[in-house]
């Protein structure tokens, strides 16, 4: 199970995927994806995988096997791994999709105001911190009292940066309510979807998802603890 799976349980806005611990994904499993193209992602706990060669787009199964062998076991060095890098021990494979637009959406605990903050932007697929520095006017922040649910008016404000049809607006309403529910029920401190894409059929899809959890609340969530990949944990932190 991955971060995407947690959100998928409440919202169906994901393409078909598989995770493999082997150098070459099994043919039968890949064929179930029923796609003419695939995205391979190195599963390491660090950002910047794409620039380090940890994300590849391929057109067919033969290319998929070739690139999987190239990435598996490779040490990726990114701005978040430090100079020693991280060895790739798992691969995540998903279907490609025809992207029309890329958005950014996150939901987090804003400790300064003791509220839940939704952050959205039409500038998806890039580092949101860079967008905040260069184009702060392109970011929308909506804060919600913890004692309340997300109202229709809140959602209208959250999706204001997005160009959505009535069909995709309904999907956005479902997604926003879903990630709010996951954040509260699982004691998460952050849920980030980047990018949230609109495809050519005007469907919203979550292409990448990140969830941070409150370590002090993990005792209430053995299902979350079971997701831990100790190969990706810092040895000193784990011992501590």
Label the model's feature ranges.
Residues 1-17, 30-192, 197-240:
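ATP-dependent carboxylate/acyl-activation modules
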């Amino acid at each position: 199970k991955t971060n995407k799976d947690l959100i998928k349980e409440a919202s169906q806005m994901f393409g078909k995927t598989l995770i493999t611990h082997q150098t070459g994904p099994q043919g039968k499993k890949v064929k179930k994806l029923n796609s003419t193209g695939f995205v391979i992602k190195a599963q390491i706990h660090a950002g910047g995988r794409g620039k380090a060669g940890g994300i590849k787009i391929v057109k067919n199964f033969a290319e998929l096997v070739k690139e999987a062998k190239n990435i598996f076991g490779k040490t990726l060095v990114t701005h978040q791994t430090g100079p020693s890098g991280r060895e790739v021990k798992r691969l995540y494979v998903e279907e490609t999709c025809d992207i029309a637009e890329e958005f950014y959406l996150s939901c987090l605990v804003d400790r300064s105001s003791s509220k839940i903050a939704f952050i959205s932007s039409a500038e998806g697929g890039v580092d949101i911190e860079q967008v905040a520095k260069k184009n702060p006017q392109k970011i929308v922040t909506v804060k919600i009292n913890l004692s309340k649910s997300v109202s229709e008016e809140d959602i209208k404000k959250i999706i204001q940066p997005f160009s959505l049809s009535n069909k995709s607006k309904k999907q956005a309403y479902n997604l926003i309510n879903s990630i709010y529910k996951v954040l509260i029920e699982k004691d998460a401190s952050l849920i980030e979807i980047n990018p949230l894409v609109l495809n050519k059929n005007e469907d919203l899809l979550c292409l990448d998802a990140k969830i941070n959890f409150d370590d002090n609340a993990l005792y209430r969530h053995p299902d979350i603890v079971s997701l831990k990949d100790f190969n990706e944990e810092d040895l000193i932190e784990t011992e501590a």
